[in-house]
C-alpha cells in the first residue's frame, strides 16, 4: 500500500529538476506524493505526478532583472538569511494543508528550511536532499573555504533563526545544530566519485547521481542539419543577466565551425545583444537535455545539476564560476578531469574558444568524462533514490527521528 510522501523545496530550477525523476518513480510505485511549488513551477511538479501544494515565495522570479546571487564575501551568511526568510514566509502557508493530510515521510532540500522545521515540529521522519556538493560529516564547506565567522550576516542569521525556532516551540534546538540534522537518510544527486571526500561518507548518504526526466514545457529544438559540432552555453536560470558575457560568446565563436546554442534567460531582451553570428543560436530558454544529447561541449556557470546532466550525456564541461559554491564545483571538474575552469578575471573570447577546443580534443578529458559517466550510471538514479526513500518508510519510527548530527 502506498504512503504519503511530502517534498519541500525552493523554487530554483537547479534544486527542483533533480527531484522530479524521484517523484515520478515514487508515484509509479504507488505512493501518494505532495510537493510544495510556486505557480511558475507547478507545471513541472504536476507533470511528474505529484499533488501540488501551492505557495508564494520570497525568491526572485525568472524574469526579475535585479536577481543576483550573493557576493563571495557574504555568500554563506546572506544565503542563510535569504532561505530563512523563505521558511518564515512559506511554512505558515503550507502547514494547514499538511495538518489536514499529514505525510508519512518528508523530503526536504538542503535550503528548504521549512521542511526541516515542519518535520522536526511534528516528529515526522525526514530525508535531506542535496542538489549540490554535500557539506556535512566528513567534508564541510565552512572548512574548505575561508569563512569570516564575524561577518555581520552570520550574526544576524543566528539571532533570527533563534527567534524563528523559539516561535515554533523549538527553542531547545541550538542554532549551530540546525544545519546538521540527523535524518533517516541523505540523498545526493551526484555520484560519490564527484563528492569531496566521497569515500568517507557513510551509508546514510545515498549518492544516487542525477535523476533526470523529460521536462514539461521545454521548447522544441533540432540539431544543425549540416552536422556542425554543437556547443551549449548556459548560465542557468538565476544569475544569468550578463549581456557582456553573451557578446563575448558571439565574438569567441564567430567564423568557427561550432554551432553554439546560447541560453540567455528571461531577464533580458535577446535583441539588446545585437545580431549574433549565423552559427550562434540565441534562445531565452533551451531544452537542455535535448541539446546535451547532441552537444560536444557544455559551457556553464558550473551549477551541479548542469554538470551532472552533462556528464550523464558524456559531454565535457567548461565552467565559468560566479559564486562560492560554483567555485568548488569548478575545482572538482578540473580535479576529476571532466573539463576545465575559466577565471572571470581576464576572460577573453580567445580564452573561451581555446578552452572549448581543448576539452573537446583532450584525450585525458575524454577518459575522465567516460569514467565519471560510468560512476553516474552505476549510482542508480531515480530507481535507487526511490529504493532508499522506501527503506525509510520501513524503518522503525525511533530510528528515523530528526536529531542533530554528532
Predicted regions span which residues?
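Donor-nucleotide binding loops and adjacent catalytic segments primarily
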Residues: 195-297
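Structural motif
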Residues: 98, 178-179, 223, 290
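Hydrophobic beta-strand segments of well-ordered beta-sheets in folded domains
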Residues: 5, 184-186, 259-260
Amino acid at each position: 500500500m502506498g504512503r504519503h510522501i511530502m517534498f519541500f523545496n525552493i523554487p530554483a530550477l537547479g534544486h527542483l529538476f533533480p527531484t522530479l525523476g524521484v517523484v515520478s518513480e515514487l508515484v509509479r510505485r504507488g505512493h501518494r506524493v505532495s510537493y510544495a511549488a510556486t505557480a511558475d513551477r507547478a507545471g513541472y511538479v504536476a507533470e511528474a505526478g505529484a499533488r501540488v501544494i501551492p505557495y508564494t515565495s520570497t525568491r526572485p522570479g525568472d524574469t526579475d532583472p535585479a536577481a543576483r546571487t550573493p557576493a563571495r564575501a557574504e555568500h554563506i551568511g546572506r544565503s542563510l538569511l535569504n532561505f530563512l526568510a523563505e521558511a518564515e514566509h512559506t511554512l505558515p502557508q503550507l502547514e494547514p494543508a499538511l495538518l489536514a493530510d499529514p505525510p508519512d515521510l518528508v523530503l526536504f532540500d538542503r535550503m528548504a528550511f521549512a521542511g526541516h522545521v515542519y518535520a522536526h515540529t511534528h516528529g515526522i521522519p525526514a530525508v535531506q536532499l542535496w542538489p549540490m556538493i554535500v557539506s556535512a560529516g566528513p567534508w564541510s564547506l565552512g572548512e574548505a573555504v575561508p569563512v569570516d565567522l564575524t561577518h555581520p550576516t552570520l550574526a544576524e542569521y543566528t539571532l533570527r533563526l533563534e527567534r524563528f525556532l523559539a516561535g515554533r516551540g523549538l527553542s531547545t534546538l541550538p542554532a549551530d545544530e540546525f544545519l546538521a540534522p540527523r535524518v533517516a537518510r541523505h540523498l545526493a544527486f551526484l555520484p560519490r566519485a564527484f563528492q569531496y571526500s566521497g569515500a568517507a561518507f557513510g551509508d546514510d548518504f545515498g549518492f544516487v547521481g542525477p535523476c533526470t526526466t523529460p521536462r514539461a514545457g521545454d521548447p522544441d529544438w533540432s540539431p544543425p542539419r549540416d552536422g556542425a559540432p554543437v556547443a551549449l552555453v548556459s548560465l542557468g536560470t538565476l544569475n544569468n543577466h550578463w549581456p557582456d558575457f553573451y557578446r563575448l560568446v558571439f565574438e569567441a565563436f564567430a567564423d568557427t565551425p561550432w554551432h553554439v546554442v546560447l541560453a540567455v534567460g528571461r531577464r533580458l531582451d535577446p535583441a539588446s545583444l545585437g545580431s549574433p553570428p549565423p552559427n550562434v543560436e540565441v534562445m531565452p530558454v533551451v531544452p537542455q537535455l535535448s541539446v546535451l544529447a547532441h552537444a560536444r561541449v557544455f559551457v556553464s556557470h558550473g551549477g551541479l545539476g548542469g554538470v551532472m546532466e552533462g556528464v550523464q550525456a558524456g559531454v565535457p564541461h567548461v565552467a565559468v564560476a560566479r559564486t562560492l559554491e560554483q567555485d568548488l564545483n569548478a575545482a572538482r571538474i578540473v580535479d576529476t578531469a571532466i573539463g576545465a575552469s575559466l577565471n572571470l578575471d581576464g576572460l577573453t573570447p580567445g580564452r573561451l574558444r581555446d578552452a572549448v577546443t581543448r576539452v573537446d580534443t583532450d584525450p585525458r578529458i575524454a577518459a575522465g568524462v567516460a569514467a565519471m559517466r560510468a560512476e553516474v550510471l552505476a549510482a542508480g538514479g531515480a530507481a535507487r533514490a526511490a529504493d532508499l526513500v522506501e527503506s525509510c518508510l520501513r524503518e522503525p519510527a525511533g530510528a528515523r527521528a530528526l536529531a542533530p548530527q554528532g
